[in-house]
Every structure is written in structure tokens, then in C-alpha cells.
């Protein structure tokens, strides 16, 4: 509490002495007003807009006669401490002050802030009227609102408190309130505040004292009218005034009278800020009245006031002090509470300070169980309802028990807090100790020469990494320059980290480190055969590479490109090659890549810059001659960040990759010993310069015999191992595999075949676990129970080929396929011949054909007309009739020139009315003069013909060499004819065919069509 002192000037003492104590004349009201204003003016803070008011009496100070202001210590034994204001025993009407979290207990103080304007105005008026009393009650809900609209929102029992100090901050009031006793709400009071009256001021002049005073006009009085009458000594109503002997205070009677005059006057506070002390008892409120009904009869007010009327002032009554006896139970509870308080203070020093603030001098807590209960409740942080229960409890033993319960909870909380604090402190202490020891160890090592500075250690580490490597001289020069630069940089700078990362990459590369290759042909052959079936071309090329390396005595790099349909083993054969050559394997895909920096790296100036994939490969494999697989090279992208396919030109050029320059390293790196293998499905999308740098090796699709062998040797054992089955659980017959390949897995690769085999084995494993049996044979009869309905029913749409229909052969990225060319005569109604598309001899084409195939159809029509004219001059069918040409399936895009001879044959068959041989299929491009030109995909087309059950093939004569390279298990049983002109094709296709009587025969109904699953495929079938 702050101590304030009001010094009264000697002149005022003289005035008080001559005017009051000598009884020369009654003191004038103007002089009283002057004394009052003078004392208040001395109390104001310099320039502060705060109103601080305290309500104390005072005791005489013998030193200088000043009035001493001090904190309320609630003790009368020390004469040097100020005495407290005498609090009235009964105060029926008090402003209601609602508390949120915990109640205020008697004899304890609390700082309260109020921001509601209505409550602030009420408290200001009460303080100005010297009525600094409030009723403090706990709210039932934890709301933020300060203004109560219903008495049911607060608990009925609270405390009567005195505003000991008040600070007016403008937007809120900050008060120090001290509780005195328990009170109970009996009703609500509505306050009527009259409006302020205008005050007329007048000036009084006292020449004797050289004083001019501004006072209200009604206060200007004379001895007869306005002066306050002084009662005689004999008047019984006159209140006796306490006198202090002169010998005790050492002051003059006049000084004491002046001080007492200032003390006893009822001073009203100024309108602004100020500090007022008064020892006189405040008068009972006169401006308040209880709300009465309109009839004029007074009636009690209910506890619940209307919600529209805010509860500002309540009518209260004192709660009687409970009577108790000092029983053994009370003594035991008291001692236990004191012991618990002692334990809490011992564990948490913060409670010691709180307790010292709560306790008063010379106050024995042990002697007062009521105060002890309130003390324990104030120290604890219990729930508001629990604290309110202690406040309302009237039975002292029960109140002690409740307070003890809260203190025990607080003690346990303090123990837990102490435990957590010890653990955290111990952890921090260990970390700090470890840090100090590490720093000391660094200093000791540095002094002994065991450890060098960080920069020196970094340099030694890099030189140690280059110890067993053959670093080129140009590279070593760059490393030395960077190490020198590193020594001059601050370790916390960004350039230091950039240089350090750069040195990390330079020293991590395998300069001159080469792995020992396997140059044994037998071992390499065994490794390749163990992993893959067939692929003789690839295996032969790898063995040639080993043979050349063996003769030269050194290894070299090569650039190979495996292209073929998906699932034929392009990626897996690369792993086998790496194992056969004893080289490290590294794979990265360039499918969809659009950033050149992925291959050649980023510039070091960029944040997070890294080298390209090839430098990362060398760092990971730690050798200069790994096998690098560049997957999906035909699907490489192109964007605004550059063209990665152009960046591959330097990488895949044997003449340039010996000095490959990465953007990040910016030093030449030798990649000439790296074996590059690229994979692609088609080579048409690969740029010509890049394709020219690679050695292309075609990987064709598998025929049924190859698929069966792969399934028996590789797929089934691996799938059974993965599912935990053995041969005693499952047996897949040869018929089941044939049906699986023919009806479910017709693609060129074996990836789909692997999925179906795994599906069958998983279902068998499920049945084994369910104990439905121990052995499950899989054959053609029960295969549908494992895989469902067949996807492909037949490759042939017609059992007997009708007139105008011929089977052709196509090649796709998925392998070979057979398809039909259908032609038919269009019947044009009258009136439609004016359409240019329906002129005589027109050709209507459908089937989702590309431009190349449409041009091929027009060429075929011209060749067919010329050939038919030479064969049957009188046959004008192709010149006069409207022809419709269709290539199923309509949803599948088709393009390419290789269907030329097939379209001519279909048109000739339609014009002559002769069907072709039933077991024939053909492919070949035709020129305008009827010459048959070579096509590609002979192996795939031959496989498709065998799959469709065709026995006779017509191929261009220039493709004879391609057919002769095919394995015998593909060509066995086939009747193959090689045509030079279309006349050769006609002789083979219409051999031993009897002419029909009609010149135009409509198509027969197809025997079987592909199922919906096969028809849903949308791959492009280019006739190459």
C-alpha cells in the first residue's frame, strides 16, 4: 500500500488555532471550503488523470505534525501504523459486484477491474459519497459479462467488502477491495439519481489573509443564516470530540485543532482525480429507496429481478457468525490444515509470498478456525463451486473439512509440479553438462593437437576421401581452389555451405574406380538363361560384348536400345545383363521428363541445386563403369525448361560422353565406360539423331509355346513361392495353360499372363487355408471357376469367309493381330445421285481409319479396277456400283499402308462374286502399278496368323529374309507365299474357288466376334 502525507502549512495551523480552538468566532463556511479544497489540492498527482482514494483515519506523528497515510494492516497495537476506517456493522444496500472464478473471503483483499460503464458510474458516485462499500458475489456461470440482469445468475451468499483504493483509468476502474463479513441477498434495490442542479459561483475576498475563494452562491453565509451552527458544550446532541493531550504529541493545541478540523470535515472528492481520507463515519444512504408497488404499500422484492432491469444494488443482511466449540475434532482439523499449509509453502515458495500478503501482523491463525478456513480456501486453486461451498458452510467442523480437502488437492498438485520441475531441471542440467564437457573436450583436443579447427578438419576429410582415387589433374586443381576458398569463408555464411556441398560432390565421385567385370562367356550365358527364356538376339549381343572386352583386355561402354511391346522383359533383361557382367545396376526413367536439369544438373547459383541423374548414378554406384538403364526413352517429354531428348545426345554419343559436362560440377566427367541400355515400345517417336546414336535390338512378342515355357519355368514357381504353396497343393495342366493364353492372355508380353497365374494360385491358397482340400488340380474345365468368363472367344469373325471379305494382318505396339477387310455394295435410292459422294463408282470408307490407310484404299480401288478390266473387260461393277469398305473394330484407330493387297483382294472378290480361300491371310503394301512392297512386323503378324488358325500366308517377296529368321516353332505348318505383284496374290487367293452364279453376293453372318472386353481396346494398329 502506498503511503501518502498531507502537509498543512503553518498559516493553516494559525487559522485553525485562532478561528477554531480559541473560539473567537465560528468558522465561516467559506473558510471551511478553503481548507477542504486546499487539502485536496495537495493530494493530487502531478499531471495524472487518475483518482486514487483511500479511507483511513490517522494517528498523530510527534515528529513534524504531518498526517501519515499508510497501508491498512488491521492492527491497533503499533502506534506508528494508520488505523483503519470503522466499518459499519449494518449496511443494508450495497452495489452488486459479480466475480467470475473464485469468491472473496472475509479479511482478504483482491484487485478487481470493472469495465461496464453503468457499474463504473455507480461506483464513482458511491465513492464520492464516502460510501465505498460493495457486495461481492460469485457468478454461477463463467461468463465475461459484468452486469447482472437476474439475481439467479449469482450465488445468494457473498461478502461485504470495502473499496480501499480506486484508480480511474477512463475505460475501466481498478480497485483494491477488502472483504469484512459474509452477507446474504434479500432483494433488489433500484436507485433513483436526481439530475445535477446548476451551481452559481461567487467570489469571497479575505484581505487579512490575501485569499480569494470561489464558492457556490448558497454557501455564502453569515453568522446568522449560512454558517453552520456550533452546538454548545451543554447540548446533549453534540458529539464529544476526542482530545489528544499536548504532552503526548508535542504539538500545539492550534496545530492539532487544524488537523482535526481537516479530518472531521465531510470532504467531497473533486470531479477529477484525487485522494481523500476521512475518519468520520459515512452517513446512511438517503438517495436510495426500495422499489414499492404502485399502491404505495411497501413489499419485499423477490430474488429474481426482471431481466430487463439490471441488478446494480441489492438489499443484503449479515450472516450470523457461527458458534462453535473447541472440540478435539476442531483442534485436529486445525492442526492438519496448518501442517498442510506448511508442506505447501515448503514445496512452492510462491505460496509463501501469497501467505505473507494475506496474513496480518500479530494475527494468530491457530486461534481462529473461521479465519483458518478462509485462509486455506484463498490459497487453494479449487473449483468455484467448491470455494463457494466453503463460503456458505455454517458448520465450522464441516467447513474445516472442506478447506482441508482443497488444501490436500493443492498439496498433491504442488508435489506433481515439483516432480515435473525436477525432471525438467535434471534433463536441462544433463544437456548443459554434456555441452560443457564437449566444449572442454574440443579445447583439450585442440591443445594436444589431436583435433584441428573445423575448416582444417573439413579439408582433411576431403583429402582423405580422394586418397585412393585417380583424380585427373584438372579436377584436382578445381578441388584445391575450392578448399582454399573454403578457408577464407565464414562458417555461417551461405557461400560456405554452397562450397562445402560442391566439394562433397566432387570428392564423392569414383575417379578412376572400376569394378572387375566378368569376361567368362559360359558364366554369362548361364546367368542370362537362368533369368530369361528365349531372347536369343539380346543374349548373343551381350556375349559378343563380353568377347570383345576379353580380347581387348579392357572394358568399354556401349549404347543399346531394346524396343518391343510391353511385358516382353526389356527392363528385367537389363538387370540380368548387369549381373552377368558383374556391373552395378542403376535405372532411371525419362518418361514424361520435361526438365533438362534432370539430366545435366542445375547451376550452383540456384537454391537447392543438384547434379544430374548420371552424376548421382556415379556417386551411388561408386564405380565408373556401371550399367545404366534409361527406361521409356520413347516417351520423353518437352517443355519450356528445355528438350531432354536433345540433352541425351551428348550423353549417348560415344565420341562425346568421355568429357560429359554437368551444369552443377562444371568439370568434365568420363562416361565412356558406362554401358547404356535404353528401352522403348516404339522407335518412331524417338528423334532421329538420338535413334542414330543407339544400337537398336528388337524384342518381339511371345508365341503360345514361348508363353507356356515361360509360365512353367519362371512365372508359376515364383507365384507359388510368394503365396507359400508347393506342388502338392496345386497342379496346372497343359490344357489349362493353353486355354489361359488363348482366351485370357493374348497380348505379346507375359505381364498379363503373370497376373492371371498369380490370381489362380491365390484362389487355391484361399481354399487351402479354409481346409476345403489339400490338392487342387487346375485344368481347362475348371479354369473359369478361378478366372471367370473368357475374355477372347475366337480370333476369327467368320467360320467361312464370304464374298468381299478377306483376313488381313496388323502390327501394334502390343504385338500382332488379325483383322478383316469387309466390302459391300451400297444401294442408292433415286434422287440421291445428285450427291457428289454417291456418284457412280464411289467408295465409302468406315472403321476409324487414318489418312495413310484411306489413301491406301483409294490406290487399291484404282489397282482393282485396272486388274479387273484386264481380267474381265465386261465387268463394270467397280466403275458403276457404290461400294462401302469397313474395317472392324470401329472403335480401334487403324492406320498404315500394309493392307493394300488385302483391300484389292476384297474388292476383286466383291466384283467377281468369288470368295477367297478360307485359310488364308495376307499383308503387303501395293503401289499404283500393282507392285507388292515390303512391310514390317513379320514376326508379330505371323504369330497372329497362327493364333487365328490360318495355314496360308501371303507376304511381300522382300520380306522373305525376315520370315526365314523366325524360329521353326513359329513357321512350322505354315504355307507361305511371297508375292511380287498383285497378280501373284490373285493366283494364290482364288485358287480352286468355284465361281458363283451371281455377280454380287451379300456377306454371311459372322460366326463369332470378339467379346466386349477385347472390343474395348483402343490401341492404334498401324500397318507398317
Curated annotation (Swiss-Prot):
EC number: 3.4.21.53
Record-level Gene Ontology MF annotations: ATP binding; ATP hydrolysis activity; ATP-dependent peptidase activity; sequence-specific DNA binding; serine hydrolase activity; serine-type endopeptidase activity; single-stranded DNA binding
Keyword presence, Transcription regulation: no
Binding-site positions, ATP: 564-571
Cellular component per GO, a single term: mitochondrion
Origin superkingdom: Eukaryota
Stated consequence of mutating residue 898 to A: Severe retardation of TFAM degradation following mtDNA depletion
Biased composition annotated in UniProt, kind: Basic and acidic residues: 285-297
Annotated region described as Disordered, given as residue ranges: 219-305, 999-1024
Bias (Basic residues) ranges: 239-250
HAMAP family, A to Z: lonm_euk
Family membership noted in the UniProt record: Belongs to the peptidase S16 family.
Summary of subunit composition and partner proteins: Homohexamer or homoheptamer. Organized in a ring with a central cavity.
Record NCBIfam families: lon
Protein name: Lon protease homolog, mitochondrial
Annotated source species: Drosophila melanogaster (Fruit fly)
Lineage: Eukaryota, Metazoa, Ecdysozoa, Arthropoda, Hexapoda
Amino acid at each position: 500500500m502506498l503511503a501518502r502525507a498531507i502537509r498543512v502549512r503553518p498559516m493553516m495551523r494559525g487559522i485553525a488555532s485562532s478561528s477554531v480552538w480559541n473560539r473567537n468566532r465560528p468558522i465561516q463556511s467559506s473558510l471551511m471550503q478553503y481548507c477542504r479544497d486546499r487539502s485536496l489540492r495537495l493530494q493530487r498527482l502531478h499531471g495524472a488523470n487518475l483518482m486514487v482514494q483511500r479511507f483511513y483515519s490517522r494517528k498523530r506523528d510527534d515528529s513534524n505534525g504531518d498526517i501519515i497515510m499508510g497501508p491498512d494492516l488491521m492492527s491497533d497495537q503499533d502506534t506508528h501504523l494508520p488505523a483503519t476506517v470503522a466499518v459499519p456493522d449494518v449496511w443494508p444496500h450495497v452495489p452488486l459486484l459479480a466475480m467470475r472464478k473464485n469468491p472473496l473471503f472475509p479479511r482478504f483483499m483482491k484487485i478487481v477491474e470493472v469495465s461496464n460503464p453503468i457499474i463504473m458510474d455507480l461506483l464513482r458516485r458511491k465513492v464520492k459519497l464516502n460510501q465505498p462499500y460493495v457486495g461481492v458475489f460469485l457468478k454461477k456461470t463463467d461468463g465475461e459479462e459484468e452486469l447482472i440482469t437476474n439475481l439467479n445468475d449469482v450465488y445468494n451468499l457473498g461478502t461485504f467488502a470495502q473499496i480501499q483504493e480506486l484508480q480511474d483509468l477512463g475505460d475501466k476502474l481498478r480497485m483494491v477491495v477488502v472483504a469484512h463479513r459474509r452477507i446474504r441477498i434479500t432483494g433488489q434495490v433500484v436507485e433513483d439519481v436526481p439530475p445535477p442542479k446548476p451551481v452559481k459561483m461567487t467570489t469571497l475576498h479575505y484581505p487579512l489573509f490575501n485569499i480569494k475563494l470561489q464558492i457556490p452562491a448558497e454557501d455564502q453565509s453569515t453568522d446568522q443564516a449560512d454558517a453552520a451552527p456550533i452546538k454548545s458544550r451543554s447540548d446533549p446532541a453534540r458529539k464529544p470530540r476526542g482530545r489528544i493531550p499536548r504532552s503526548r504529541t508535542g504539538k500545539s493545541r492550534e496545530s492539532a485543532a487544524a488537523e482535526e478540523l481537516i479530518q472531521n470535515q465531510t470532504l467531497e472528492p473533486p470531479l477529477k482525480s484525487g485522494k481523500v481520507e476521512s475518519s468520520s463515519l459515512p452517513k446512511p444512504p438517503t438517495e436510495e429507496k426500495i422499489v414499492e408497488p404502485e399502491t404505495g404499500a411497501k413489499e419485499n422484492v423477490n430474488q429474481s429481478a426482471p431481466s430487463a432491469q439490471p441488478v446494480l444494488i441489492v438489499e443484503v443482511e449479515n450472516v450470523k457468525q457461527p458458534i462453535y466449540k473447541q472440540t478435539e475434532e476442531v483442534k485436529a482439523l486445525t492442526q492438519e490444515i496448518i501442517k498442510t499449509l506448511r508442506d505447501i509453502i515448503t514445496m512452492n515458495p510462491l505460496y509463501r509470498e501469497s501467505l505473507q500478503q494475506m496474513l496480518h501482523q500479530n494475527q494468530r491463525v491457530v486461534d481462529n478456525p473461521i479465519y483458518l478456513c478462509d485462509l486455506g480456501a484463498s490459497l487453494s486453486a479449487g473449483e468455484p463451486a467448491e470455494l463457494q461451498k466453503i463460503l456458505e458452510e455454517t458448520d465450522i467442523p464441516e467447513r474445516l473439512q472442506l478447506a482441508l480437502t482443497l488444501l490436500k488437492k493443492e498439496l498433491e498438485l504442488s508435489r506433481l509440479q515439483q516432480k515435473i520441475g525436477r525432471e525438467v531441471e535434471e534433463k536441462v542440467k544433463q544437456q548443459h553438462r554434456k555441452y560443457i564437457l564437449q566444449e572442454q573436450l574440443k579445447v583439450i583436443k585442440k591443445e594436444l593437437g589431436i583435433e584441428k579447427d573445423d575448416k582444417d578438419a573439413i579439408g582433411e576429410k576431403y583429402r582423405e576421401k580422394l586418397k585412393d582415387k585417380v583424380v585427373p589433374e584438372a579436377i584436382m586443381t578445381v578441388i584445391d581452389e575450392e578448399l582454399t576458398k573454403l578457408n577464407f569463408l565464414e562458417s555461417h555464411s551461405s557461400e560456405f555451405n554452397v562450397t562445402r556441398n560442391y566439394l562433397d560432390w566432387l570428392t564423392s565421385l569414383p575417379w578412376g574406380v572400376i569394378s572387375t567385370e566378368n569376361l567368362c562367356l559360359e558364366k554369362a550365358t548361364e546367368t542370362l538363361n537362368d533369368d530369361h527364356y528365349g531372347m536369343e538376339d539380346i543374349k548373343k549381343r551381350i556375349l559378343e560384348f563380353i568377347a570383345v572386352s576379353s580380347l581387348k583386355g579392357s572394358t568399354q561402354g556401349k549404347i543399346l536400345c531394346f524396343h518391343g511391346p510391353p511385358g516382353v522383359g526389356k527392363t528385367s533383361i537389363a538387370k540380368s545383363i548387369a549381373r552377368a557382367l558383374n556391373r552395378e545396376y542403376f535405372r532411371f526413367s525419362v518418361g514424361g521428363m520435361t526438365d533438362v536439369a534432370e539430366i545435366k544438373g542445375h547451376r550452383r547459383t540456384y537454391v537447392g541445386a543438384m547434379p544430374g541423374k548420371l552424376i548421382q548414378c556415379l556417386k551411388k554406384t561408386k564405380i565408373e563403369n556401371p550399367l545404366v538403364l534409361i527406361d521409356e526413352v520413347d516417351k520423353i517429354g518437352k517443355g519450356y525448361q528445355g528438350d531432354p531428348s536433345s540433352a541425351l545426345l551428348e550423353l549417348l554419343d560415344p565420341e562425346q560422353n568421355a568429357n560429359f559436362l554437368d551444369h552443377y560440377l562444371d568439370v568434365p566427367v568420363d562416361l565412356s565406360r558406362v554401358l547404356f541400355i535404353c528401352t522403348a515400345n516404339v522407335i518412331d517417336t524417338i528423334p532421329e539423331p538420338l535413334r542414330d546414336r543407339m544400337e537398336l535390338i528388337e524384342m518381339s512378342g511371345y508365341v503360345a509355346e514361348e508363353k507356356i515355357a515361360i509360365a512353367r519355368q519362371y512365372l508359376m514357381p515364383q507365384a507359388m513361392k510368394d503365396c507359400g504353396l508347393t506342388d502338392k497343393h496345386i497342379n496346372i495342366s497343359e490344357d489349362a495353360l493353353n486355354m489361359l493364353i488363348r482366351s485370357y492372355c493374348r497380348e505379346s508380353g507375359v505381364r498379363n499372363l503373370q497376373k492371371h497365374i498369380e490370381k489362380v494360385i491365390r484362389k487355391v491358397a484361399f481354399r487351402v487355408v479354409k481346409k476345403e482340400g489339400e490338392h487342387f488340380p487346375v485344368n481347362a474345365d475348371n479354369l473359369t471357376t478361378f478366372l471367370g468368363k473368357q475374355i477372347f472367344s475366337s480370333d476369327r469373325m467368320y467360320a467361312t469367309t464370304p464374298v468381299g471379305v478377306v483376313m488381313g494382318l496388323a502390327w501394334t505396339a502390343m504385338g500382332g493381330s488379325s483383322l478383316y477387310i469387309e466390302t459391300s455394295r451400297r444401294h442408292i435410292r433415286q434422287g440421291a445421285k445428285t450427291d457428289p459422294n454417291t456418284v457412280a463408282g464411289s467408295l465409302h470408307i468406315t472403321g476409324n481409319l487414318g489418312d495413310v490407310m484411306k489413301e491406301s484404299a483409294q490406290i487399291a480401288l484404282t489397282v482393282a479396277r485396272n486388274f479387273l478390266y484386264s481380267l474381265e473387260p465386261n465387268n463394270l461393277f467397280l466403275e458403276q456400283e457404290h461400294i462401302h469398305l469397313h474395317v472392324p473394330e470401329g472403335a480401334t484407330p487403324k492406320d498404315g499402308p500394309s493392307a493394300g493387297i488385302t483391300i484389292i483382294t476384297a474388292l476383286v472378290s466383291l466384283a467377281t462374286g468369288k470368295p477367297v480361300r478360307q485359310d488364308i491371310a495376307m499383308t503387303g503394301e501395293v503401289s499404283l502399278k500393282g507392285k507388292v512392297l515390303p512391310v514390317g512386323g513379320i514376326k508379330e503378324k505371323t504369330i497372329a496368323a497362327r493364333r487365328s488358325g490360318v495355314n496360308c500366308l501371303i507376304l511381300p517377296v522382300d520380306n522373305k529374309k525376315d520370315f526365314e529368321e523366325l524360329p521353326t516353332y513359329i513357321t512350322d505348318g505354315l504355307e507361305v507365299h511371297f508375292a511380287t505383284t498383285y497378280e501373284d496374290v490373285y493366283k494364290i487367293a482364288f485358287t480352286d474357288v468355284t465361281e458363283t452364279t451371281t455377280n454380287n453376293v451379300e456377306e454371311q453372318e459372322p460366326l463369332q466376334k470378339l467379346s466386349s472386353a477385347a472390343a474395348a481396346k483402343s490401341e492404334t494398329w498401324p500397318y507398317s
